[in-house]
């Protein structure tokens, strides 16, 4: 069976949920979650400069993070496990400024989220997980910033019930190292 790329633009302009190319047979599966030409054919310019992975335990929240300089668009996919992935529009001129959207990413559904420049990004780890980031800009520690996961103005509705309640949360703000 072959599943072609599918691009679903969210109502936060420039953000997408992407179903990658996937070919399965009796041996297993082949998944391609990025192809520069396919992305460009769908109106998305996402040139890769850095790829990394995070490994997280159930109950961790990787809070809303972003870069103040050299904005970093990202293609995010859960390779294994399950995360509730959240993006936040941080563009003051945008009609959706301050709004957030969440989507369940799992190793099984293989969906990706394209996080545009000038957006915040974070996630709740529902199951022990490995998450892939394919970034259009390298990480600049001096420009790293974030918003608390429980910020009252954003009022993100994290699915705490999936991890046994909010008292089981372990907050972290990832500081990547080169």
Task: Please report, for each region that a protein language model flagged, where it lies by residue.
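Hydrophobic heptad-repeat coiled-coil signature
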Residues: 115, 176-178
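Conserved metal-binding segment of the jelly-roll/cupin
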Residues: 106-127
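Non-catalytic, conserved peripheral segments adjacent to functional cores
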Residues: 1-108, 133-175
């Amino acid at each position: 069976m072959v599943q072609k790329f599918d691009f679903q633009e969210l109502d936060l302009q420039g953000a997408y949920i992407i179903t990658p190319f996937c070919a399965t047979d009796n041996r297993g599966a082949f998944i391609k979650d990025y192809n520069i030409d396919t992305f460009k054919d769908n109106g998305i310019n996402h040139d890769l400069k850095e790829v990394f992975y995070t490994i997280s335990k159930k109950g961790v929240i990787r809070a809303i993070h972003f870069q103040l300089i050299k904005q970093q668009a990202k293609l995010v996919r859960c390779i294994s496990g399950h995360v509730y992935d959240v993006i936040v529009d941080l563009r003051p001129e945008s009609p959706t400024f301050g709004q957030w959207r969440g989507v369940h990413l799992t190793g099984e559904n293989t969906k990706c989220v394209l996080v545009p420049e000038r957006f915040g990004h974070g996630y709740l780890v529902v199951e022990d997980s490995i998450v892939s980031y394919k970034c259009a800009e390298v990480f600049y520690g001096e420009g790293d910033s974030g918003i608390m996961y429980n910020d009252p103005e954003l009022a993100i509705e994290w699915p705490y019930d999936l991890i046994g309640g909010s008292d089981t949360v372990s907050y972290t703000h990832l500081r990547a190292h080169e």
